[in-house]
């Protein structure tokens, strides 16, 4: 399966195009079929406000256009601003999936599945209210078992994170939401902030509600993590 943005109408940026899933079914050493289908989110055919009247985000308003994963028997189309959308093996959209009501914020488009435990690790960000970032963990059966806040000083754009055998790594970097720009409609509201700083957060996987240790780094921005692993008493993070 492949997911990506496909604008249906003129737009300022193709990243905001609606998600389209492309699939190839392999059987007996042959491709039995290829098909592509829109991810028909609640906002695909209807106008859904991005924010609710109380200022919280409408998590069902989604383009679901960035990634697609399979975990615990469910196939999920992802975009970091919204809830995941479940699709079938025939690429039909089932609907928004909130882990049986336990997920109350967005889900990153770059979750990590532990190859040893089968756990799904992910986070959500984007709320203008605290906590701005929340870490989540679902077990191998798909039950959401952990929701905990990640303390960051402002609404940072945390696009990706990293997972090692023993740790979860968070990237608190200086691309930050600017509410004034958003209210005035002056383009992309996430901007570089010279005063914000940059740091990496380290959380032990065996103590998921424990302290997150923060380490200051040179200001930068990381879109994607390539690899991360534990190396004796150190942690190695490779990113772009």
What kind of region is each of these model predictions?
Residues 1-240:
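Beta-propeller domains
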């Amino acid at each position: 399966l492949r997911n990506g943005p496909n604008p249906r109408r003129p737009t300022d940026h193709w990243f905001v195009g609606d998600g389209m899933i492309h699939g190839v079914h392999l059987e007996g050493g042959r491709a039995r079929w290829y098909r592509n289908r829109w991810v028909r989110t609640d906002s695909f055919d209807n106008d859904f406000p991005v924010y609710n009247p109380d200022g919280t985000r409408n998590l069902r308003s989604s383009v679901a256009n960035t990634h697609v994963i399979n975990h615990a028997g469910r196939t999920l189309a992802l975009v970091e601003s919204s809830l995941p959308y479940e699709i079938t093996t025939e690429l039909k959209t089932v609907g928004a999936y909130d882990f049986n009501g336990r997920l109350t914020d967005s889900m990153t488009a770059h979750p990590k599945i532990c190859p040893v435990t089968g756990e799904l690790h992910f986070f959500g960000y984007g709320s203008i209210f605290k906590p701005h970032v929340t870490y989540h963990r679902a077990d191998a059966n798909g039950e959401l078992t952990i929701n905990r806040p990640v303390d960051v000083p402002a609404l940072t754009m945390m696009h990706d994170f990293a997972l090692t055998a023993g740790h979860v790594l968070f990237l608190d970097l200086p691309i930050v939401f600017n509410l004034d720009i958003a209210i005035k409609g002056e383009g992309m509201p996430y901007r570089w902030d010279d005063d914000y700083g940059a740091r990496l957060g380290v959380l032990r996987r065996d103590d998921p509600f424990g302290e997150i240790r923060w380490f200051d780094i040179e200001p930068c921005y990381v879109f994607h993590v390539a690899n991360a692993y534990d190396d004796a008493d150190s942690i190695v993070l490779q990113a772009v």
